[in-house]
């Protein structure tokens, strides 16, 4: 039963990888695109060697490629001159995989046991050490850059290599599923939320008011910042939005151009006037 579930995860993760690849290409997220593309390319290794030998190679080099594609400078478009470096990395690792998968010395060195691990039973302790180090690096890097989703995706992508019972089938991962969910959520946020204030935008306001028979609306217009630099004005709007998100309880706040719109659903007029005073 358990093995049949593992077998089914292989094609399921492949489907999510294709979905993540298409979504990231459409949304022009070059980092996620090339990370997922590297996962798809890694599957070719399993056509050249048995599962065990392919796992040894993929468990060491695919996480390295993942980290490399995260830290490389993000390109505006998916395919441009900067992308040639990433394509070259994929070609180089692919050639390396063709050679090392059939290397007895490489497979023997990767299979050596150096210590006992209580919880995990990795296929290779060498690759496991690198996995832990890379995972910790991405968590710290993501916390510093505000991009923790890459650390989460990394952990979900290589769980298979941490447990011996999961090594009997081909490559599967959960990182592509996470990327699909992230891209869908990110698209939703960009459509219905203001970029700077993080408050719902005009589209969200229109959707909110659909079906309302009665409610009170209030508006706060922010003006007098013409002398400020555009960068400083955005910072100020961001701070105002942060204050309103914390202070406006039981009131829905929306950002429409230079105005903050308040929607009072179940409050009477006197309470609404008092809030806006």
Task: Show where each model-derived region lies.
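Regulatory sensory/coupling modules that transmit signals to nucleotide-handling catalytic cores
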Residues: 1-188
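Short, mixed-charge, low-aromatic patches
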Residues: 161-167, 198, 231-237
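Transmembrane-cytosolic junction motif
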Residues: 184-202
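Conserved long alpha-helical elements within nucleotide-processing catalytic cores of c-di-GMP signaling
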Residues: 192, 202-216, 224-245, 254-258, ...
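Conserved metal-coordinating catalytic motifs of nucleotidyl cyclase and c-di-GMP turnover enzymes
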Residues: 197, 218-221
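Short catalytic/binding micro-motifs of nucleotide second-messenger systems
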Residues: 247, 277
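Short hydrophobic/aromatic beta-strand micro-patches
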Residues: 263-265
């Amino acid at each position: 039963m358990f093995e049949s579930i593992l077998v089914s995860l292989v094609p399921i993760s492949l489907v999510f990888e294709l979905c993540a690849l298409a979504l990231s290409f459409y949304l022009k997220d070059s980092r996620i695109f090339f990370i997922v593309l590297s996962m798809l390319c890694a599957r070719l290794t399993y056509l050249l060697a048995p599962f065990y030998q392919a796992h040894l190679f993929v468990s060491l080099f695919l996480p390295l490629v993942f980290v490399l594609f995260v830290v490389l400078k993000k390109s505006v478009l998916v395919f441009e001159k900067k992308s040639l470096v990433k394509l070259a990395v994929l070609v180089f690792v692919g050639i390396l995989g063709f050679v090392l998968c059939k290397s007895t010395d490489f497979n023997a060195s990767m299979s050596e046991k150096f210590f006992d691990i209580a919880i995990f039973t990795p296929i290779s302790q060498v690759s496991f050490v690198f996995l832990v180090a890379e995972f910790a690096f991405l968590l710290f890097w993501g916390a510093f850059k505000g991009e923790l989703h890459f650390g989460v995706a990394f952990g979900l992508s290589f769980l298979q290599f941490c447990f011996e019972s999961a090594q009997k089938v081909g490559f599967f991962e959960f990182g592509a599923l996470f990327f699909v969910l992230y891209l869908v959520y990110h698209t939703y946020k960009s459509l219905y939320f203001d970029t700077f204030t993080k408050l719902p935008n005009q589209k969200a306001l229109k959707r909110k008011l659909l079906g309302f028979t009665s409610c009170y609306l209030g508006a706060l217009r922010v003006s007098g910042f013409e002398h400020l630099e555009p960068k400083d004005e955005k910072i100020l709007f961001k701070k105002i939005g942060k204050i309103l998100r914390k202070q406006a309880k039981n009131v829905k706040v929306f950002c429409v151009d230079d105005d903050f719109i308040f929607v009072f659903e179940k409050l009477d007029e006197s309470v609404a006037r008092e809030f806006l005073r």
